[in-house]
């Protein structure tokens, strides 16, 4: 019965010319190879590594080839506590708070557009101020105080200026401070807390700034953490961090995410945007269950308990920003643009902190940082804050700058739509089939690879600079699978013919 049902289709198939039969078989094999690889994609050896290598190469390709005509006008200044500055300050164990105050005051009074401080501020350092340190405000009595107290008093008065209306809100830049985040502390009577990617981290409150920041609408804590891959490279950001603060569940945004939110003011589903409302909503959505913070052995909730993603919209770029507890590798990828040696005066400028704190006869002009995003950080070797990235080694503050720039200039990396991906893949399968039908297997493979490199590679690179990713690795794997499968049915086995001699059998 089944044999007779397929008889009409078989007759139509037999009427097709051999070339058409060969082409249709090739198309079917290519489609099967694509579907099988798509389903088994997480388990295909080498595929994830090849895709990571491809994005690394694309980042390095565009690093020095950026078009200066951009949709955004993000400009960054890095106040670098470099090796020379560190030695001039007497090689202190902690960044001197009186020097840090001078850097903060210089940027705030310029005024900068935003100030990000990537310096450890959890511990109180009871030191007396250095007599060589000169304040930009000689009448300010804070210079005779203990440095930590002077810094706290300045930040308190800075916030009060906003509340009292002494300065317009736009003239007082927001300040984002690096929150110290580490492993959970072990309880006195309990077993040691487990460590690893699946365990919660704990925020370490500042011993002298906690109350000042908590009561201010302009001062904020944020996470400086990033992900380090198995090969030691920092490729991915962590846009937020579920944590415990004391024994209470909490969620803290990354320095890049909070900076993006302050400058882009995304639409909120509940009322008007403010940094406080943004952080409250982030905590409401992504804070861990309360029980996990009570028990020191608490770990991240199981995968089926992860909250739904929070989709925000960047009106400047016209792109979505997806906050998820389980983001894809592509959604976390950092588009690195700046190195320590980058010379892009319109986009990035590195200023040794020594030029600001150690006054000379020709102090720097505040116009140098006015209207720009200022990041204070360190690059001296003893600070142990140097990281390997796809474009080379850089200090943690430079990683933060690249994260902020990536979010605001390119947005979160997203794949092109599924319709475009599969349409393009089917067209490539047609090209594979035609190549293998017109030419030998060797020539067909070479021509197919050439077409991918000549067409798909330029298109993928062009989209990459705008934060879109058109995968060129997966089609190459499909081509390899196609070459393996095509011998199964398309290539007929060789036929050995035996010729009988005329006198045989006589």
Regions found by a protein language model. Name each.
Residues 309-358:
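Long, low-complexity, polar/charged, intrinsically disordered or flexibly structured peripheral segments
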Residues 9-301, 369-444:
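Non-transmembrane functional regions of envelope-associated proteins
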Residues 295-306, 310-328, 362-364, 369-372, ...:
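Solvent-exposed, non-transmembrane regions of membrane-associated proteins
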Residues 413-488:
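Transmembrane alpha-helical segments that form the functional core of multipass membrane systems
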Residues 364, 407-408, 464:
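Hydrophobic residues in alpha-helical segments
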Residues 482-506:
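A juxtamembrane structural motif centered on a specific transmembrane helix
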């Amino acid at each position: 019965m089944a044999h007779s049902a397929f008889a009409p289709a078989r007759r139509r198939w037999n009427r097709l010319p051999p070339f058409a039969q060969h082409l249709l078989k090739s198309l079917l094999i290519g489609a099967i190879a694509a579907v099988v690889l798509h389903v088994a994609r997480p388990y295909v050896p080498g595929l994830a590594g090849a895709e990571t290598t491809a994005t690394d190469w694309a980042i390095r390709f565009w690093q020095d080839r950026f078009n200066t005509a951009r949709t955004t006008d993000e400009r960054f200044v890095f106040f670098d506590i470099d090796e020379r500055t560190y030695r001039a300050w007497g090689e202190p164990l902690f960044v001197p708070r009186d020097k840090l105050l001078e850097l903060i005051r210089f940027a705030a009074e310029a005024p900068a557009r935003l100030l990000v401080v990537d310096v450890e501020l959890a511990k109180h350092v009871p030191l007396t101020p250095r007599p060589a340190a000169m304040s930009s405000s000689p009448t300010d009595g804070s210079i005779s105080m203990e440095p930590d107290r002077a810094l706290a008093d300045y930040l308190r008065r800075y916030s009060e200026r906003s509340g009292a209306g002494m300065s317009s809100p736009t003239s007082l830049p927001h300040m984002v401070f690096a929150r110290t985040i580490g492993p959970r502390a072990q309880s006195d009577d309990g077993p040691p807390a487990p460590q690893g990617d699946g365990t919660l981290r704990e925020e370490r409150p500042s011993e002298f700034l906690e109350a000042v920041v908590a009561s201010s609408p302009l001062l904020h804590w944020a996470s400086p953490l990033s992900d380090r891959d198995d090969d030691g490279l920092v490729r991915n950001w962590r846009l937020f961090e579920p944590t415990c603060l004391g024994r209470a569940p909490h969620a803290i945004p990354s320095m890049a995410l909070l900076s993006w939110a302050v400058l882009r003011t995304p639409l909120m589903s509940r009322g008007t945007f403010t940094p406080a409302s943004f952080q409250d909503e982030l905590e409401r959505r992504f804070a861990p269950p309360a029980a996990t913070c009570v028990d020191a052995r608490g770990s991240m909730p199981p995968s089926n308990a992860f909250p739904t993603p929070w989709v925000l919209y960047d009106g400047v770029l016209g792109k979505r920003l997806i906050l998820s507890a389980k983001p894809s590798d592509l959604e976390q990828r950092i588009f690195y643009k700046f190195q320590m040696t980058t010379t892009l005066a319109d986009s990035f400028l590195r200023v040794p902190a020594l030029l600001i704190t150690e006054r000379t006869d020709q102090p720097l002009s505040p116009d140098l940082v006015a209207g720009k995003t200022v990041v204070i950080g360190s690059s001296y070797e003893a600070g142990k804050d140097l990281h390997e990235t796809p474009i080379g080694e850089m200090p943690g503050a430079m990683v933060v700058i690249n994260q902020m720039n990536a979010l605001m200039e390119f947005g979160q990396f997203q794949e092109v739509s599924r319709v475009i991906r599969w349409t393009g893949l089917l067209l490539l399968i047609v090209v594979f089939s035609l190549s293998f039908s017109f030419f030998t297997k060797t020539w067909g493979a070479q021509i197919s690879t050439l077409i991918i490199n000549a067409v798909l590679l330029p298109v993928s690179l062009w989209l990459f600079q705008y934060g879109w990713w058109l995968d060129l690795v997966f089609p190459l794997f499909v081509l390899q699978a196609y070459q393996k499968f095509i011998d199964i049915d398309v290539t007929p086995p060789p036929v050995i013919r035996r010729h009988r001699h005329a006198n045989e059998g006589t």
